[in-house]
Amino acid sequence: MYKRQVSNGHTAAIFFSFKDSANKPSVEEIEKMWAEYKGVPQELNLPHAPKQFIHVYTEKDAPDQPQIKTAREIDGGMAISCGRLRESTQYDYKMVSMSHNTLRGAAGGAVLLAELLTAKGYMD
């Protein structure tokens, strides 16, 4: 295995299939679902929540994205990026996702969790 040193970012290559592959959504439908997704932090408009949780790169507009250096700072590093969504020969689809490991992961994730717990009344 070869590991390349990358600062402040995690990239995941994801392969997935649907339970009913014959009726799977199209690439465009999946990208639309991602782009429109809003979680509880967005619904509550928490201070450190990204405005758009999932930033979508389409094959048409950015076929080689996400890339660490260009995607890790989106929405203050709190958004995740998805792209390169393509049909797969072994699964229904394959894709690449990227997030900032300290801003979204450790530090920012802890701050966002504290904001959520406070908003839900678990903390003062």
Predicted feature residues:
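C-terminal substrate-binding/catalytic lobe of Rossmann-fold NAD(P)-dependent oxidoreductases
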Residues: K3-K94
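NAD(P)-dependent Rossmann-like dehydrogenase/reductase catalytic/cofactor-binding core
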Residues: E73-D124
